[in-house]
Amino acid sequence: MTTGKLLDETATLLIGKNILSVKPGKRRLTIVNGGQTGVDRAALDSAMHLMLPCRGWCPNERWAEDAAIAPNYPLQECGSPTPAVRTELNTIDSDGTLVLSRGNPQDGTPLTVERAKLHGKPTLELNLDETPDVAAFWAWISKHDIRILNIGGPRESFAPGAVYTPTRKILDLILDPTR
């Protein structure tokens, strides 16, 4: 398995019954987060769509603002009903954090950035209203040797209908190791 290793040449991976060609300078990242609506949910959906490993910690009873997090998301309950606990654990369990937001981060997003800095984890912030620089993203991943990427940002209620979709488009673009 090539997870965690930057590739110097195109490699072919067999994942289940699917064959993927991973481009040079990219790797199959593992995505972690807490499964909240908005950015978290888009990140997990993107990871599953791209056949990237994903996991994370979520509050007890799989709490999210819309309902209990569906069982198809591979998350573990963190032993606390407090979202801040899962934020802490996901930050600790990752090599770096990607934050997607608009303007000044709100909700639990500033806590995610604060926890990443506290634990010495590199953080990259992307604006949901801008087209990301894919090469710059992968250069950041390479520079910090990130294998497990925590992805966070606002809940869907922060801007109903305007968080999940742009996040999903951005992540489908930048996380795809075959592009």
Q: What name fits each language-model region?
A:
Residues 2-4:
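Extreme N-terminal basic, low-complexity initiation segments
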Residues 6-148, 153-177:
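Acidic/glycine-enriched connector segments
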